[in-house]
Amino acid sequence: SFKKGLFLGTILGGA
């Protein structure tokens, strides 16, 4: 869950 949250957070943050 943590990895997914961090991964999605990076994408949303970059986007």
Swiss-Prot record:
Give the induction note. Answer: Overexpressed in acid environments.
Q: Which domain of life is it from?
A: Bacteria
Name of the protein in question = Acid shock protein 1
